[in-house]
Amino acid sequence: MIDVNKFDSMQIGLASSDKIRSWSYGEVKKPETINYRTLKPEKDGLFDERIFGPTKDWECACGKYKRIRYKGVVCDRCGVEVTRSKVRRERMGHIELAAPVTHIWYFKGIPSRMGLVLDMSPRALEEIIYFASYVVTDAGDTALEKKQLLTEGEYREKREEYGDGFKAAMGAEAIRTLLRDVDLEKECAELKEELREATGQKRTRAVRRLDILEAFLNSGNRPDWMVMDAIPVIPPDLRPMVQLEGGRFATSDLNDLYRRVINRNNRLKRLLDLNAPGIIVQNEKRMLQEAVDALIDNGRRGRPVTGPGNRPLKSLSHMLKGKQGRFRQNLLGKRVDYSGRSVIDVGPKLKLNQMGIPHEMALELFKPFMMRELVKREMASNIKNAKRKIERRDEDIWDVLDDVIKEHPVLLNRAPTLHRLGIQAFEPVLVNGKAMRLHPLACEAYNADFDGDQMAIHVPLSDEAQAEARLLMLAAHHILAPKDGKPIISPSQDMTIGNYYITLEEAGREGEGMVFKDVNEVRTAYQNGYVHLHTRIGLQASSLAKLGTPFTDWQKERILITTAGKAIFNEILPADFPFLNEPTQENLTGMTPDKYFVEPGTDIKEFIKNQPLVGPFKSGFLSDIIAQVYKEYKVTATAELLDRMKDLGYYESTKSGLTVGIADVTVLKEKPEIIEQAHKNVATVAKQFRRGLITDEERYNRVISIWNKAKDDIQAKLVENMDPSNPIQMMSDSGARGNISNFTQLSGMRGLMAAPNGKTMELPVISNFREGLSVLEMFLSSHGARKGMTDTALKTANSGYLTRRLVDVAQDVIIREEDCHTDRGLDVTAITEGNEMIEPLYDRILGRYTMKEVKDPNTGEIIVPANVLVEESEARKIVDAGVQKVTIRSAFTCNTRHGVCERCYGRNLATGDEVEVGEAVGTVAAQSIGEPGTQLTMRNFHQGGVAGGDDITQGLPRVQELFEARNPKGRAVITEVTGVVDTVEENPAERTKEVTVKGETDTRTYSLPFTSVLKVKEGDQVHRGDALTVGSIDPKELIKVRDVLSTENYILREVQKVYRMQGVDISDKHIEIMTRQMLRKVRIMDPGDTDMLPGTLLDISQFKDRNTSAIIEGRIPATARPVLLGITKAALETNSFLSAASFQETTRVLTDAAIRGKNDPLVGLKENVIIGKTIPAGTGMKKYHDIEPEVVNSNVTDGVYSISELEEKINEQQNNVESSN
């Protein structure tokens, strides 16, 4: 076998008939498969052991030679080589054809490759190949022309007229003759001449022909290889035949297709031997051609060959195509050993990086490790006995199992894996039952719940795999989400409500104003009922300072006013973390505010009475605490805090006794008045409509707004009258579950419902759930529910497909180097829409490198120098100083090939540190954009029925429109000149508006539809590329009028708009990477003195290289213009044919790659996965493979076997060092 890790690239080409014969181990002559009695393969048949190898390991067909000692012997009786049966998966045979046939891919593809080489139409080719017309292959001295088509009648006439003065033929033989006659070099030279003058259609055709001919010329492929004399027979184990119970056979469709070819081929041979009449032979040749076509690509031409039940047979092409094809089913996604799946259940007592594994599962998954350990401990004499012991479930194996799984991480995965947090590593802990246990905080990343979800478990086997699982994939490392760098693990539901409840404050609770020495005393008082969790008390600050809490000297001498609950809550935080007394950023990042401290001797009860109540810690603030702890203390401390927060939350939410009863749903007294008023207003509107004062559309819009206002009024009243101790209010306020709109539906009114067509129905549901709905109202509600369900189902599929396309276009973007030394940057400002802030400047500069120094606009002093990573503190300074625009390093302007450099990328959001070389940022970017896709809406919004306002596409369709570079719906007209809007005139006759823009050198007039809404008025200054009307700019127009960078910037801003409007935060850098991939190609306009062809697409880097060498040699360089490709097109235009073929349009990609003799440099991830090579990202990068480990402080690890022992030793050493200091 070849070692895939040894080679650097892979080439594809056309196979000549000689090549096919050289692959073959013998000719298949008979259509037989296996003997129905002996079930042994037939001689010379499709499963022949002489050709393909033995069916049993180390055994010939007749049984004369058995066992490995005869390895390599060829049996003299049956002619079978003694070897492994595995060779039946790799040895090929061939069929010698009695007449040549054309390969359907090259004849039928669009454009027809044969047609381009021969300069003939596909229709003409079809007539020749399928024996409908003759073609002149050699005109001799006659008046005929080469390649002229003749019908049967015309052919006879010409034969009579000219005799043997010309040659004409039909079928693939004629095509092969013509292809052999093509002089590639001469044709290329002629076409290049023609290109100098040609225009229009003629030029396009010439460019396409030249492209194909040069491809043949440069690749060393010969055009006549598109016609075959022999066809390969793929190994039998890849087209198996298996016996079903009941004695019938199931076989791969390929065997049927091969049998048809062999039958027809053998019949043709016999007919030729018999010298049968030409018409019969011709018919048989045509049938052979059709049989080979069906084998290669069934259904491409004519009706597909069908099997039983009229099912089209799967040909070789279908084996590669689609989700079930070879690429996506077997090469990119394999089933793996050492894996299992089970239902998940909650494991509230687990630590963050643990999972519970059922005994039975662990025993099966860790069986080899168990057997080794049993033999090692001499509990079993050999592996066989150990296996028996495990199968018997002996009592003494369970302790061994406990030790085997200790410190051996396993991977858990939940489908659908939308982002990289869908697979994480945990340390297994044995549990009873058959369900796996998952830590409740890991649910959010997996989007898992415990209503019957299943998860898959995988065991990393090698030491390297285990080390990577532990150091890179352990759940504790996945605290921040890669899409925005905010914590993805944060307490939810019960945990939130528990922590909310413990930090609540109430006035006048029992024991208010008591002063305590330390937290232990507070806890004792609480447990004995002297104080309540919500009681405001005094606590000696010095006792907390002794434990490490940072207080100023002034604060240390005073008494801290807090509540009993907050004192207990603060115990879970790291020792030297500020004491949290209020949910504010100042308290979190600075110190506890001075206002909570009083002098000893003050009347504390009186002081407390005059103090306002401080709000409890809600879900958002808990998340902020986690982010801050992670930033300061990194992984271990954060994981510990999370577990403590979880335990405290569950404990306190249980103790709080939070319940919901019908009495908790309050009824609003003012509701009948509001409803009555709304009814009156609706009646007024109806009257106006009847009198013809308003149109039906206006009436509809007004009715909708009346009912929406009524609902809003009821909601506002509810909020006013809300009791803060109401359990439903507590749930929604803390962020544990539910929001104000749920509350309105329970005790206010349900309001308007959506109809299945997406419009809102005029009839509102006036009741709420507390009162109960009437039958009609229930019926109205059900419409909206169905719409919601269908929308969700469609959205999931659309979003998944978007993710797949995004991953495909960006999978080869990896951090390749530390600095690309670019001299360009990106100017960023806050993204706004009207008065609404979409993305503030702070978010855009955080975690990025500055390109130029940032100066204070007032004083001129430098806030942040150039080439520095902007941390939180610097970003805050920049924003506070009032800076509006910052120039940063960006993926848009990075010079690195096939990727990005560390400086242009900035911070790795998932770790909070600078990104490292090898990080697969392209895949992460694609997942970050695709994963929230399901949260986006599917709708196009109407502009509130404003006449003439086109629908604005939003949500998922808008994201697809931008990334696919489609013409946007509701397109805006842009100006092509910079200048002043001179006139805006209406032209009622033409039903248009005319806007004239006067530039310095040029004046343009734009004729706009009458209904379009203008963005400009007379006298406005406009810059080229600015929109004149309301709507979406077409980026393809923008790139023509402006430059690449402003187009990239426009796409970035537009994508951000969609996501941020829906409340989804995504970092700019992900969108930058995707947009850059859409703009990495240029189209050659004028080739100059280079060998590039006009109109071809080239990578920017290749284009620059070729131009550089042309300039060095003193030739005229080529000119090109940048091209914006949609992500699907960009993914297919990649340099890797393996990656493109496994994405879409498999046959087209492979046909093209073969003709060009393409070389796949194996730069991306996908192509390496396909050939089974280590991916060139992360620890698989070359850079990391050539490292010699350096021994540091070797005495630490002497005689240490487990990680826990190692940690103890290291701690011991540190303690010794500290004590000696």
From Swiss-Prot:
Keywords: DNA-directed RNA polymerase, Magnesium, Metal-binding, Nucleotidyltransferase, Transcription, Transferase, Zinc
Entry's EC annotation: 2.7.7.6
Sites where the protein binds Zn(2+) 1: C60, C62, C75, C78
Binding residues for Zn(2+) 2: C820, C894, C901, C904
Cofactor field: Mg(2+); Zn(2+)
InterPro entries: DNA-dir_RpoC_beta_prime (IPR045867), DNA-dir_RpoC_beta_prime_bact (IPR012754), RNA_pol_asu (IPR000722), RNA_pol_N (IPR006592), RNA_pol_Rpb1_1 (IPR007080), RNA_pol_Rpb1_3 (IPR007066), RNA_pol_Rpb1_3_sf (IPR042102), RNA_pol_Rpb1_4 (IPR007083)
GO terms under biological process: DNA-templated transcription
GO CC, any one term: DNA-directed RNA polymerase complex
UniProt GO molecular function: DNA binding; DNA-directed RNA polymerase activity; magnesium ion binding; zinc ion binding
Catalytic activity: RNA(n) + a ribonucleoside 5'-triphosphate = RNA(n+1) + diphosphate
Top-level EC class as recorded in UniProt: transferase
Cofactor binding note: Binds 1 Mg(2+) ion per subunit. Binds 2 Zn(2+) ions per subunit.
UniProt binding sites for Mg(2+): D449, D451, D453
Pfam families recorded: RNA_pol_Rpb1_1, RNA_pol_Rpb1_2, RNA_pol_Rpb1_3, RNA_pol_Rpb1_4, RNA_pol_Rpb1_5
Subunit structure: The RNAP catalytic core consists of 2 alpha, 1 beta, 1 beta' and 1 omega subunit. When a sigma factor is associated with the core the holoenzyme is formed, which can initiate transcription.
Family membership noted in the UniProt record: Belongs to the RNA polymerase beta' chain family.
Role played: DNA-dependent RNA polymerase catalyzes the transcription of DNA into RNA using the four ribonucleoside triphosphates as substrates.
Protein name: DNA-directed RNA polymerase subunit beta'
Higher taxonomy: Bacteria, Bacillati, Bacillota, Bacilli, Lactobacillales
